[in-house]
């Protein structure tokens, strides 16, 4: 399912949604944190999707366990380091790992900027051990915690802007619309960082218009509701706004009721720039190759179409043209 001449990338991949079950177990015991199970085997269903669960509430509960064990900055560093290893072991040539320092910090009141530094340090350690994979970082503002929390989060992220390639807005799209964050994204644009926004997942197409036209997003996370607005679909295709599509996650969170309803095919047929991603691979219990198999076996995509999706990911990456060429050269 994977074309070995094209770099394999994962652009929408939450670092804080990819914590190993073993790591949750070990950090929980190390720091005296009460876990919901008394063995590694019985812990897995509390932190990973088993079978065909499709509940947003269940998904988010599993996600929360991944940050509940981040009791100190060493734990944060370990998780970041292991994320690089997991990316390399899954066969990725390039990944953009995104993380919310506030979400990672809040359970144990860690310093936000300290979390950012620990993630950067952990990723650098991981890259020394796994030089075959290239990694960039995207900082997230978690809107679910409110405007002030996002200000603190952005301050911590922009203090290390030279170690990031973009800023994202994630969380409660309905309760905290993007319009609340216009000032935040003016700062992001002034910093020169790229912008990607979770939109059109819980809210409708208007959320995507707002993310693009007001916040300055050049990529959209999920974007499943775009298909409800033909003018938006035309705009996405014309302006090469990239859609970071995450089919398994969308199914597991009930964003779509079935893969037959997933808009990936509609995006492709409309000429929209779209690629496949894992979202929270630790929770979903998947890797990037799983998404390509799914697209082929259950969504009817041909090998040629999968190769185009794979190449789209390279085109959409927040990297320079010379870095893009280097990724391709390494596959020759």
UniProtKB/Swiss-Prot annotation:
Keywords: Hydrolase, Metal-binding, Nucleotide metabolism, Zinc
Active site: 201 (proton donor)
Cofactor-binding details, from the entry: Binds 1 zinc ion per subunit.
Enzyme class: hydrolase
EC number: 3.5.4.4
Highest taxon listed in the record's lineage: Bacteria
One Gene Ontology biological process: purine ribonucleoside monophosphate biosynthetic process
Cross-referenced Gene3D superfamilies: Metal-dependent hydrolases
Stored InterPro entries: A_deaminase (IPR028893), A_deaminase_dom (IPR001365), Ado/ade_deaminase (IPR006330), Metal_Hydrolase (IPR032466)
Entry cofactors: Zn(2+)
Family: Belongs to the metallo-dependent hydrolases superfamily. Adenosine and AMP deaminases family. Adenosine deaminase subfamily.
Protein name per UniProt: Adenosine deaminase
Protein species of origin: Shewanella amazonensis (strain ATCC BAA-1098 / SB2B)
